[in-house]
């Protein structure tokens, strides 16, 4: 308790921490908690199981409590608010709502970006909520640009999310990253007219007075949102005309210039030249902290930690809410209406509630992105930027929004780019460094070579069910086609997984498969061996964890594995991201992950203090054809086995290349073992070894002593000689004096 109190943690939280047997803070907690309590933005990276959740939860809970306590006692902070009223009073491009390399002339109408690699955008100072309106844009050079309309929620990269409508110089219209042919190309000296009919919900454009026809119908979710003139440039220059000057091509059919729009139709931008300041009015659906997680399991795990840490906090009590998919929204809305202080959720459901106004972000003091690299890899960068833009940068009591980003690695380009965009001079707390394999983890590769191991030919129909990628192919023995070898690999991997379990008498292991259907097929094969979910204690008792299983089943399966009711957890990479499972003795990679960082996440699950951990990867020596769904259903009911480049949903998976990339990433050679999966035993301590990597990486005490023994003997001889010389020199002067 004293250790946490010394960092400034309040006694109530320290008491709860002590009951959890956390006697001392972990390294990541010791570094991060004081920084967050001090009001800073923090970027943190540490190993799974290092106490990372506590590192951000403890200070967030404390500051939220202190904020509520101040409000309860009527204390108010002072916020200095500047306004850009002079800018917002006229129609022009907004200098406070633009990209970092977007320049605006003194008239507010001439715009330029000379960045040649990145797009930079800008919105106008005013938007519209009603009526029929028009403005013109003239192209001053041959650079790339898109012009159009967007809401305040939209990204400045116009047309790449569901809140903006753009028309580009390449003759493409764009909305929600959908780029379709429209109209015709435009370039230097062309004038583009931008039409907006809010009453009908129509957006269209013209080129040099030529009407190009309807471009977009405004979707229902945007009917009540103000739309602002917007553009995005790459090495280009534009000049806007909102109607203060005479139009080159005046509009017809009742469209009026933006500058002539009635004041009742016009709204001013929220970007006013200083940080947006939160309103002081209490709202029950406006939390003080928002924690975003990439998966349901992680969100539930974090919420449980929050409940534990706040156990002794009272007057006022903190109210928390879990917002995830797969749960009735009405239950979550009911809790929101009664008031919440801390929200933990996943992007999908959070986005729904924020976009419909059910979840209000105007009071948020903390934005926490846990497993940020996972969120970005799942395509949630637009969501993150959108919610960050909606959160006031200054709270009603004058405090600054704090952003905390947790990531498995801070060496990801996407994470660095995100931090530069949404964080304010963040402190980096990197206790993980570049990826490496702990000394307690032995990892080996088992080559799966269907050309040398012909077992797959002799199994008949008793083998594992495969993923039906080759349902229409001739894969019978003798075909000697890539498809035949690919199907053989799938069959052999099922056999090798069973063989590994039997050979090492595995009592507990996590088994990673590449896809959800692979997980289901392996579970079914274990059931054929007599195991399965309902066979407690059986050699092949197992449960599955992946996105297609219902939330309550996923939660139940995770708990059953943790309690030891079943031996094996068969899962996709969802379990490799932060879920509180570590210290298992074995991991089996049925297929290598396509991201090398995920390999380290997977095998990092193994190892205990009293026994070394063993990670076995089954690596195909030939290419395997696998599912890679790019269809709208994301694989549900899809049987399109054509290759991705041919409009299908499959790819050829090259595990040997992936293995090479992993070895290069870790700067080591991973030892290979024979298909019998017998791993060599170290003579000194009886633990498994993984050969060359062990020798290179150190940690083998006996081998280390053998190597150093001759050097130590030589040093001992030199030491003896030096001391003898010193003694000889000490007596020599006395002997010389006596001779005289």
Swiss-Prot record:
The modification Phosphoserine is found at residue 481. It comes from Bos taurus (Bovine). One of its GO terms (biological process) is double-strand break repair. The helicase domain is involved in the stimulation of RELA transcriptional activity. This is ATP-dependent RNA helicase DDX1. There is a cross-link at residue 281 (Glycyl lysine isopeptide (Lys-Gly) (interchain with G-Cter in SUMO2)). Residues 1-525 are annotated as: Necessary for interaction with RELA. The modification N6-acetyllysine is found at residues 239, 268, 281. Residues 2-428 form the Helicase ATP-binding domain. It holds the Pfam family Helicase_C. Residues 70-247 form the B30.2/SPRY domain. SMART domains: DEXDc, HELICc, SPRY. Found in a multi-helicase-TICAM1 complex at least composed of DHX36, DDX1, DDX21 and TICAM1; this complex exists in resting cells with or without poly(I:C) RNA ligand stimulation. Interacts with DHX36. Interacts (via B30.2/SPRY domain) with DDX21 (via N-terminus); this interaction serves as bridges to TICAM1. Interacts with FAM98A (via N- and C-terminus). Interacts with PHF5A (via C-terminus). Interacts with MBNL1. Interacts with CSTF2. Interacts with HNRNPK. Interacts with ATM. Interacts with RELA (via C-terminus). Component of the tRNA-splicing ligase complex. Interacts with PQBP1. It comes from the Eukaryota. Keywords: Acetylation, Activator, Antiviral defense, ATP-binding, Cytoplasm, DNA-binding, Exonuclease, Helicase, Hydrolase, Immunity, Innate immunity, Isopeptide bond, Mitochondrion, mRNA processing, Nuclease, Nucleotide-binding, Nucleus, Phosphoprotein, RNA-binding, Transcription, Transcription regulation, tRNA processing, Ubl conjugation. Its EC number is 3.6.4.13. GO terms for cellular component: cleavage body; cytoplasm; cytoplasmic stress granule; cytosol; mitochondrion; nucleolus; nucleus; tRNA-splicing ligase complex. Residues 1-295, 525-740 are annotated as: Necessary for interaction with HNRNPK. InterPro entries: B30.2/SPRY, B30.2/SPRY_sf, ConA-like_dom_sf, DEAD/DEAH_box_helicase_dom, Helicase_ATP-bd, Helicase_C-like, P-loop_NTPase, RNA_helicase_DEAD_Q_motif. It catalyses: ATP + H2O = ADP + phosphate + H(+). It is found in: Nucleus; Cytoplasm; Cytoplasmic granule; Cytoplasm, Cytosol.
């Amino acid at each position: 308790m004293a250790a946490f109190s010394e960092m400034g943690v309040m006694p109530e939280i320290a008491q709860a921490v002590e009951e959890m047997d956390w006697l001392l803070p972990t390294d990541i907690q010791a570094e991060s908690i004081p920084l967050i309590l001090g009001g800073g933005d923090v970027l943190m990276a540490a190993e799974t199981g290092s106490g990372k959740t506590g590192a951000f939860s403890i200070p967030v809970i404390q500051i939220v409590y202190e904020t509520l306590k101040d409000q309860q006692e009527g204390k108010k902070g002072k916020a200095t608010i500047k306004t850009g009223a002079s800018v917002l009073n006229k129609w022009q491009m907004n200098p406070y709502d633009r990209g970092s390399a977007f320049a605006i002339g003194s008239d507010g109408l001439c715009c330029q970006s000379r960045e040649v690699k990145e797009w930079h955008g800008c919105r106008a100072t005013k938007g519209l909520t009603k009526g029929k309106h028009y403005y013109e844009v003239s192209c001053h050079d041959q650079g790339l640009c898109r012009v159009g309309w967007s809401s305040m929620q939209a990204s400045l990269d116009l047309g790449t999310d569901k809140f903006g409508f753009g028309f580009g110089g390449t003759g493409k219209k764009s909305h929600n990253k959908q780029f379709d042919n429209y109209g015709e190309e435009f370039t230097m000296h062309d004038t583009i007219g931008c039409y907006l009919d809010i009453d009908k919900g129509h957006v269209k454009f013209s080129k040099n007075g030529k009407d190009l026809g309807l471009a977009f119908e405004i979707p229902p979710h945007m009917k009540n949102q103000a739309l602002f003139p917007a553009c995005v440039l790459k090495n280009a220059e534009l000049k806007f005309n909102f109607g203060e000057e005479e139009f080159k091509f005046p509009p017809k059919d009742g469209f009026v210039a933006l500058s002539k729009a009635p004041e009742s139709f016009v709204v001013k931008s929220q970007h006013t030249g200083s940080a947006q300041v939160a309103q002081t009015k209490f709202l029950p659906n406006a939390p003080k902290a928002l924690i975003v997680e990439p998966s349901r399991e992680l969100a539930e795990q974090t919420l449980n930690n929050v409940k534990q840490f706040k156990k002794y906090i009272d007057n006022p009590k903190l109210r928390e809410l879990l917002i995830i998919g797969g749960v009735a929204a009405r239950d979550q809305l009911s809790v929101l209406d009664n008031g919440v202080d801390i929200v933990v959720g996943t992007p999908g459901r959070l986005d729904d509630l924020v976009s419909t106004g059910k979840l209000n972000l105007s009071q948020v003091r903390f934005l926490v992105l846990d497993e940020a690299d996972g969120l970005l890899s799942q395509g949630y960068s637009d969501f993150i930027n959108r919610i960050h833009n909606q959160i006031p940068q200054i709270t009603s009591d004058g405090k600054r929004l704090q952003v905390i980003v947790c990531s498995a690695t801070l060496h990801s380009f996407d994470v660095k780019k995100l931090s530069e965009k949404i964080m304010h001079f963040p402190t980096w707390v990197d206790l993980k460094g570049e990826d490496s394999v702990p000394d307690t983890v032995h990892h080996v590769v088992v080559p799966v070579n269907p050309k040398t191991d012909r077992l797959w030919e002799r199994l008949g129909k008793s083998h594992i069910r495969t993923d039906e990628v080759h349902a229409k192919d001739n894969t019978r023995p003798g075909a000697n086609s890539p498809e035949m070898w690919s199907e053989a690999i799938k069959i052999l991997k099922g056999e090798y997984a069973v063989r590994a379990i039997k050979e090492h008498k595995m009592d507990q292991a996590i088994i990673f498969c590449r896809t959800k259907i692979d997980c289901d097929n392996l579970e079914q094969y274990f059931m054929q061996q007599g195991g399965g979910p309902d066979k407690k204690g059986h050699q092949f008792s197992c449960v599955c964890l992946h996105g297609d299983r219902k939330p309550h089943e996923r939660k139940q399966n995770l708990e059953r594995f943790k309690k030891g009711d079943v031996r094996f957890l068969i899962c996709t990479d969802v379990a490799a991201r932060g879920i509180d499972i570590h210290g298992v003795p074995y991991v089996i990679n049925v297929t290598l992950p396509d991201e090398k960082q995920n390999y380290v996440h997977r095998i990092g699950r193994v190892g205990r203090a009293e026994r070394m951990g063993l990670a076995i990867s089954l690596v195909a020596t030939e290419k395997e054809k696998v599912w890679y769904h790019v269809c709208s259903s994301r694989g549900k009911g899809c049987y399109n086995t054509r290759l991705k480049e041919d409009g299908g949903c499959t790819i050829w998976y090259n595990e040997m290349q992936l293995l090479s990339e992993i070895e290069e990433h870790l700067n080591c050679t991973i030892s290979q073992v024979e298909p019998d999966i017998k791993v060599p035993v170290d003579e000194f301590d009886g633990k498994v070894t993984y050969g060359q990597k062990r020798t290179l990486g150190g940690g083998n005490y006996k081998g280390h002593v053998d190597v150093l023994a001759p050097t130590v003997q030589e040093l001992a001889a030199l030491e003896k000689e030096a001391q003898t010389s010193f003694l000889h020199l000490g007596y020599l002067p006395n002997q010389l004096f006596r001779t005289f």
